[in-house]
């Protein structure tokens, strides 16, 4: 088979056969194709798209390019929740103890942050939680506490890593079929009864519009249907930072406040999204007959002590110390802190969640290339959230870092603030 013929065929809008797609994925996996040839193929897909059969074949071949993980969930309903990436998105960390308190089993593989999107693994490691476990060790965690969050295995869908790196440098990141196959190949490599995807759209997401997110969801549903897997997708707005924090240890601190019901320290939007996600999981998995019953069950669970106890057990089993979570000053103790004040009175908004994320990265909370080191204590607290009324001189943002915070940091943060009188 010849890669030039495949590129030409897709370039002219013709559908590829399963044999051709399998050959392409196998050739990428064994490194027998040049990067420029793979890139040309990706660009042809970007222009011409893929039909549902091609998409299924591509995803299946990507799954088969690596290992699949099979865990024993001990007859409990198993759920995998995935977010397509957002700013201030700490939902997975808060969700796991609630779901296990509701008697679900949650085996989750997560990634690190890159660019303006934060990573769950970085957030957990910032508070001493270990995430590097073998499948056997992960099963042991599941046996003891019905859950784990570990780093993405190098052996799962290795072809996706190659394709993603090339998409990132060839302006083909926003190809919906390629996004769908990338996300689903990793989700399908693990056995779970249900896959829930929190699909973000807006200024802080790669889907800039709700229409684009809906189209991507249809690709994902098509793949799941052909694999005979249960998939539920929730579309959620990422035009604002989620919650009151951007960072690593700082976002875990907001999760702690949430689980301990210290509501003044938690963003109202984060509280609302958590309720929506859990109630939709309860309804979709038939644990609740309707929304009213699901909401009641969610609140009864959250208001009890079980989620907090499950969380402490989770972090302890994964190598951190539960004692440090009882003293929040030990959990989050940045060396430097600087307020950013309102210049006038009025109604607050922010230019973009991405702008805030870039300030956070400049403080040390993120990475622009994979080799960048992260400052676990760096980040931003949104003391005032969008649409709140502020007075001149009010603290709007607080900046944190382990290194001195410069006037340039404060100026950059001030540029993200809009106050309308």
UniProtKB/Swiss-Prot annotation:
GO terms for cellular component: cytosol. SUPFAM superfamilies: Nucleoside phosphorylase/phosphoribosyltransferase catalytic domain (SSF52418), Nucleoside phosphorylase/phosphoribosyltransferase N-terminal domain (SSF47648), Pyrimidine nucleoside phosphorylase C-terminal domain (SSF54680). Its EC number is 2.4.2.4. It is an enzyme of class 2 (transferase). The keyword Glycosyltransferase applies. It comes from the Bacteria. It catalyses: thymidine + phosphate = 2-deoxy-alpha-D-ribose 1-phosphate + thymine. The keyword Transferase applies. Keywords: Glycosyltransferase, Transferase. Homodimer. Belongs to the thymidine/pyrimidine-nucleoside phosphorylase family. The enzymes which catalyze the reversible phosphorolysis of pyrimidine nucleosides are involved in the degradation of these compounds and in their utilization as carbon and energy sources, or in the rescue of pyrimidine bases for nucleotide synthesis. This is Thymidine phosphorylase. It comes from Mycoplasma pneumoniae (strain ATCC 29342 / M129 / Subtype 1) (Mycoplasmoides pneumoniae). The lineage of its organism: Bacteria, Bacillati, Mycoplasmatota, Mycoplasmoidales, Mycoplasmoidaceae. The gene is deoA.
């Amino acid at each position: 088979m010849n890669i030039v013929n495949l590129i030409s065929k897709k370039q002219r809008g013709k559908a590829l056969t399963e044999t051709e797609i399998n050959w392409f994925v196998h050739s990428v996996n064994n490194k027998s194709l040049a990067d420029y040839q793979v890139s040309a193929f990706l660009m042809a897909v970007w222009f011409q798209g893929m039909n549902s059969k091609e998409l299924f074949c591509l995803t299946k071949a990507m799954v088969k390019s690596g290992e699949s993980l099979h865990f024993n969930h001990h007859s409990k309903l198993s759920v995998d929740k995935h977010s397509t990436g957002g700013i201030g998105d700490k939902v997975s960390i808060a969700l796991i103890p609630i779901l296990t308190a509701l008697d679900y089993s949650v085996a989750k593989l997560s990634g690190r942050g890159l660019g303006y999107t934060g990573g769950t693994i970085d957030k957990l490691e910032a508070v001493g939680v270990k995430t590097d476990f073998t499948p056997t060790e992960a099963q042991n965690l599941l046996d003891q506490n019905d859950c784990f969050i570990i780093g993405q295995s190098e052996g799962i869908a290795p072809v996706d890593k190659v394709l993603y790196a090339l998409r990132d440098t060839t302006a083909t990141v926003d190809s919906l079929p390629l996004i769908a196959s990338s996300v689903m190949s990793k989700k399908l490599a693990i056995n779970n009864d249900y896959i829930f995807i929190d699909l973000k759209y807006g200024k802080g997401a790669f889907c800039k519009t709700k229409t684009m997110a809906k189209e991507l969801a249809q690709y994902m549903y098509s793949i799941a249907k052909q694999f005979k897997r249960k998939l539920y997708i929730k579309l959620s707005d990422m035009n604002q930072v989620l919650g009151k924090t951007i960072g690593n240890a700082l976002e875990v601190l907001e999760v702690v406040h949430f689980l301990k019901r210290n509501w003044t320290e938690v963003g109202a939007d984060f509280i609302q999204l958590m309720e929506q996600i859990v109630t939709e999981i309860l309804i979709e998995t038939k644990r609740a007959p309707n929304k009213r019953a699901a909401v009641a069950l969610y609140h009864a669970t959250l208001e009890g002590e079980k989620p907090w106890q499950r969380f402490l057990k989770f972090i302890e089993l994964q190598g951190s110390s539960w004692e440090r979570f009882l003293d929040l000053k030990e959990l989050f103790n940045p060396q430097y802190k600087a307020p950013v004040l309102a210049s006038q009175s009025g109604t607050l908004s922010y230019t973009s969640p991405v702008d805030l994320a870039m300030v956070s990265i400049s403080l040390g909370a993120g990475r622009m290339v994979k080799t960048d080191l992260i400052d676990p204590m760096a980040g931003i607290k949104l003391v005032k959230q969008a649409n709140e009324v502020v007075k001149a001189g009010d603290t709007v943002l607080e900046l944190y870092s382990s290194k001195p915070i410069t006037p340039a940091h404060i100026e950059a943060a001030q540029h993200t603030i809009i106050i309308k009188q």
